[in-house]
Amino acid sequence: EDHVFRVDHYLGKEAVQNLLALRFGNAMFEPLWNARHIEQVQITVAETVGVEGRGDYYDHSGAMRDMLQNHLLQLLCLTAMEPPSQFDPSAVRNEKIKVLRSLRAIEGADAASHSVAGQYTSGAIDGRAVPGYREELGRDSGTETFVARRAHVDNWRWSGVPFYLRTGKRLPRRCTEIYLQFREVPHSIFPGAVPQPN
């Protein structure tokens, strides 16, 4: 077991690898990276493709298992974690575990108010007709191809800040982004103007 390495391939993306440097190597961002200054965090992984021949696999996993429970949670951990004691895999993993342990459980009746799921139907992307999920699969299915969830990290740094995680297939544009919305200033010096949050 000590010789087996399990790696989420999303962690190999350059932008994901640079997230730790942006956070912990940048004196401008780190002091602002908390609930006092950030109103909400949105993490989106949107794909324009359908299941593309992976229907049998995807129909057993869906967007929740295929994307949210691994890739999006990895991005949430990198966004919400505390600085590791040193830059090595063990220290980074320990900080990620602390974030996962701080996630508020979503149970029972709360599930409906904290998450939404859907399935793509036939339509058009970039003017090209595309089949719906069930047409691609060749059978009826209730498997979700889109999922969005509101999460909360209940710790000192992030108390009260919602994290919106969303992912899906056959969406209008392909993107992977982490969006932090900063809080409004306490008093605007520009009368009549309502500045947009950054």
Where are the model-predicted features located?
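Secretory/organelle targeting and membrane-embedding segments
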Residues: 2-198
